[in-house]
Amino acid sequence: MLGQMMYQPLLISSLIDHAARYHGEAQIWSVSTEGGVEETNWAGIADNARRLGSVLTDAGLAPQSRVATLAWNNRRHLEIYYGVSGAGFVLHTINPRLFPEQLVYILNHAEDRILFFDATFLPLVEGIRPHLTTVERLVLMGPRDEAAAARIEGLEFYDEFVATGDAGFDWPDLDERTASSLCYTSGTTGNPKGVLYSHRSTVLHSFGSNTRDCIGFSARDVVMPVVPMFHVNAWGTPYACAMSGSCMVLPGPDLHGEALVGLIDRYRVTIALGVPTIWQGLLATARAKGSTLESLTRTVIGGAACPPSMIAEFRDRYGVDTVHAWGMSEMSPLGTTNQPLAKHGALPIEAQHKLRENQGRPPYGVELKIVDDDGNTLPNDGQTQGDLMVRGHWVLDSYFQLQDQPILSDGWFATGDVATLDRDGYMTIRDRSKDIIKSGGEWISSVELENIAVAHPKLATAAVIGVPHPKWDERPLLVAVKAEGETPDEAELLAFFDGKIAKWQVPDRVVFVEALPLNATGKVLKRTLREQFRDVLTG
């Protein structure tokens, strides 16, 4: 016997319809490529999304055709998010920071039919166009630009493209399991792999994000996603904010500290989301300009382990609560967020602060476990380290166009992380499996060493890698970037570890570099560092 309740499919079109119907006047401020600020609202986004959906449908695109973007966080990109998926096509957001060869591979592998792009990327698109085998239409995201039209034959313009559409377009009825968006993993080796999300997984992910003990956006929030919309759907923020009716600030291409502080103060941002490297610049600017970040109540930090010193500065200097989060492209990306339990209020304040440093617990919809090398489940005791496995409603089961290559083990996905879990489900990422340092049979967490190093006031940032050692197999090496105007030496930095970790875990050496090599999503390329410094202890 089935329950006697209505069935309505979980579709992305229902999110934008809800936002327009019940939160239509909620404002959205969008920084343009040129630097000006446009103001719209959810009703305006919904109208243009429908217009776009109607134009794409009338163009004769086959259902599930891929439509790509090379774009920053702005209102046109937000309209494309809903117009493409809502009309039954697949939104393919592409990271413009990839090498041109990777962009060509991704566009061709995805078999994209249309490419929307911001004016910033006109030279890039001009260069790769001859190598694109499936793209039929190129659309610059803006008004007509005759100079741009002269550079690319047949170039179309978004504002004209959408103006011909129908704001009364009816969204198609779709199976909720229909593919909605596509994102390729950044990967530090080999070609990127595609992760294909569904309408169902996206809406469920939004429900998960909006639970109070997760991120919990509300109609009273002004949300600024600094995480790019070309990276894992901006952590699902554009969808979750439509569900909650939050106002949004879309920061455009300039993510430097001065620009972000200005947006927070001007538009009274309450929640901002991004990776640690972004917040380093923002905090430095706030200190220099004397901004109190008065409106900001929460930062959500993921993409890499958040240094405890950063959490402390947000908390103690600005009264901002930091929600430490973890996830990955294969998880849409939400895996865990760190929110305290009721019992933690009885802990000493320092113990409460310490608890907030780990990656937190999964929301409903995600399950975690750790296993040993033989696949045996390990205890949740907060001490035992193992390979982290996940499963859930918004976790992939195969990569795009690689369905014949199984990646699950008994229904679980191996994340490639080494972690611990405690009895309450709080997770601490100890390292990536490939980055953990194996020294004399013991494991040393590079993340733990990095968190200590970046707390030193004379360092801008740092990475720790394992390098070959004639006796211990591997030993940790600290690769450091000096803060502007500072001149720390090796002895000073190594002494900073005293009393914070066991002596045998302290890095053997320090090398200084001008900048750390980063991949397209801002993560440190430790493989590059290992190759560069592999002989530093043996040469």
Curated annotation (Swiss-Prot):
Presence of keyword ATP-binding: yes
Enzyme class label: ligase
Pathway given in the UniProt record: Lipid metabolism; fatty acid metabolism
Binding site for Mg(2+): T185, E330
Known EC number: 6.2.1.44
Free-text disruption phenotype from the record: Cells lacking this gene show a delayed growth on methylmercaptopropionate (MMPA).
The reaction(s) this protein catalyses: 3-(methylsulfanyl)propanoate + ATP + CoA = 3-(methylsulfanyl)propanoyl-CoA + AMP + diphosphate
UniProt binding sites for ATP: H231, G303, H324, A325, S329, Q359, D417, R432, K523
Cofactor entry: Mg(2+)
Regulation of its activity: Activated by LiCl and NH(4)Cl. Inhibited by dimethylsulfoniopropionate (DMSP). MMPA concentrations above 2 mM relieve the DMSP inhibition and 80% of activity is regained at an MMPA concentration of 8 mM.
GO BP: any one term: fatty acid metabolic process
Matching CDD domains: ttLC_FACS_AlkK_like
Record keywords, A-Z: ATP-binding, Fatty acid metabolism, Ligase, Lipid metabolism, Magnesium, Metal-binding, Nucleotide-binding
MF term (GO), any: ATP binding
Site (Plays an important role in catalysis): K523
Cross-referenced SUPFAM superfamilies: Acetyl-CoA synthetase-like (SSF56801)
pH sensitivity of activity: Optimum pH is between 7.5.
InterPro entries hit by this protein: AMP-bd_C, AMP-bd_C_sf, AMP-binding_CS, AMP-dep_synth/lig_dom, ANL_N_sf
Subunit structure, as described in the record: Homodimer.
NCBIfam families: PRK06187.1
Function: Involved in the assimilation of dimethylsulphoniopropionate (DMSP), an important compound in the fixation of carbon in marine phytoplankton. Catalyzes the ATP-dependent ligation of methylmercaptopropionate (MMPA) and CoA to yield methylmercaptopropionate-CoA (MMPA-CoA). It is also active with short-chain-fatty-acid (carboxylic acids up to six carbons in length).
Annotated PANTHER family: ACYL-ACTIVATING ENZYME, BUTANOATE--COA LIGASE AAE1-RELATED
Protein family: Belongs to the ATP-dependent AMP-binding enzyme family.
Protein name per Swiss-Prot or TrEMBL: 3-methylmercaptopropionyl-CoA ligase
Species: Ruegeria pomeroyi (strain ATCC 700808 / DSM 15171 / DSS-3) (Silicibacter pomeroyi)
Biological classification of the source: Bacteria, Pseudomonadati, Pseudomonadota, Alphaproteobacteria, Rhodobacterales
